[in-house]
Design a protein with these regions (language model features):
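C-terminal recognition in membrane/secretory proteostasis and scaffolding
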Residues: 1-113
Length: 113
């Protein structure tokens, strides 16, 4: 899975992402440079409906640990073939809301007509 393909899959799901590097690690105050950072959430998408937030770090998709963009791409490709799956995120404290942080699980369900 290339980084470009993983990023494209993320956009189809409804998020603009990048691999957590040293710069993102420092900005978000993370212990390790692991996971995939959510840089933007696209309105009207599955990701927005699941409540995924900007500045969160995706740590797992459907119980598959995410450390790299390749992990993210493979796990998201498998998960979106199903109707329902979960996305585990770590949401660092926002400077304006130091209480609102922690690990969250987002349920992603398919839309039915």
């Amino acid at each position: 899975m290339t980084k470009e393909k993983a990023i494209r899959l993320g956009e189809q799901f409804g998020i603009v992402v990048d691999e957590v590097d040293a710069e993102i690690q420092k900005e978000l105050g993370l212990q390790r440079a692991e996971g995939v950072a959510v840089l933007e959430v696209i309105g009207g998408t599955m990701a927005e409906g699941a409540g995924i937030k900007v500045r969160s770090v995706i740590k797992e998709i459907d119980k598959v640990e995410i450390k790299t963009l390749a992990d993210f791409g493979w796990a998201l490709a498998r998960a979106t073939k199903q109707c329902n799956f979960t996305v585990g995120t770590y949401e660092p404290a926002d400077p304006g809301d130091p209480v609102g942080w922690g690990v969250n699980f987002h349920f992603v369900g398919c839309k039915r007509d």
